[in-house]
Amino acid sequence: FCAAAEETSKNGGLVQGRGDAYCGMLNASYNLKLRNIKAYIPEYPVGTAEQCADMIHEFAPIAKAVYALNHLKIISFGPRPLNFLACNAPIKQLYNLGVEIEENSELDLFESFNKHAGDFRIPGGVAEMEKELGKGNKKPEVLAKLAQYEITLLDWVEAHKGYREFVAIAGKCWPAFQTQFGFVPCYVNSRLTAKGIPVSCEVDIYGCLSEFIGTVVSDDTVTLLDINNTVPQDIYDEDIKGKHGKYTIKDTFMGFHCGNTASSKLSFCEMKYQMIMARALPIEVTNGTLEGDIVPGDITFFRLQSTSDAKLRAYIAHGEVLPVATRSFGGIGIFAIPEMGRFYRHVLIEGNYPHHGAVAFGHWGKALYEVFKYVGVPVEEIGYNQPAGVRYPTENPFA
């Protein structure tokens, strides 16, 4: 809802031409509440024709996201890994958001994968992957299996989405996946995400939900990363301090996943193997990661989550990926978020968020905040990186 401002006082503009926009907007909001109708009202909802057109333009991604959530099915495969209990996913809030979920066994997926052996589409999928990877095609021997898996997932989506228009996938990737399928699914996850079917790792249901929202709002490919590790002092001193704004070392961290970030969001990419798994398994069953440093530029780190007791909670933070080499492995980048250290302690830890965060490329916090508010996240449960001097409720004033 927006209202037309008074345009002029000339020629009786405030006599016969007065629109009384302030009064009208108040009455509109009153009647919306009476009827329990949700509506988006801009921060300052009164303006000229041009300003109101801009407000409508800002509303478009919000409206798209709300529509998309009401037409989304999440398809999951397998339970969370026992030794990594970190992404609890009460499903009640999914239905409150208008989202449907279909939970499947890994065994169902494995059966379908085996039935796709020799599928006539596999060579075409391999050719696509070879073209995308280019010189980064370091594991050509695994491409046929990856193409078979990709076709399996795409066919599953078509067969199971029902009346729903959109699909996101929460996939399993360990501990039994690699030994039974013979590869890791990271690269396929990245490719489907780039096609508009976000795929999360480790059966992270609210992770793929967050990715989906980011995809719709930004109209671009997103990724899902671990808020993973600190930046070593030597990298900070050599490549960041005094060169990239006023970031302290506590404002920086590394966002990492094994290899699920799309090639379009990497500065360079190579097909490799999952190094962590390969410490205990043969390398050949861990092939399938897409590795490289994430492209530098503005980002929004965010997540929508149902807590273990089924309350909706979210966080949003603007930041950037710095143009600094990571010297590490996986799909990884050096992130900088103003006041990240405090945000990490008093939003992420205090709010009991899991380690996965969705990353949208660009600054989309304004739209995401409105989406979260519209779909029912209490405003006091939407965390953000508060500037220096603005204390979090749990922050020790004497620290």
Walk through the language-model features, giving the residues of each:
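Extended hydrophobic packing segments that form well-structured cores
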Residues: 276-399
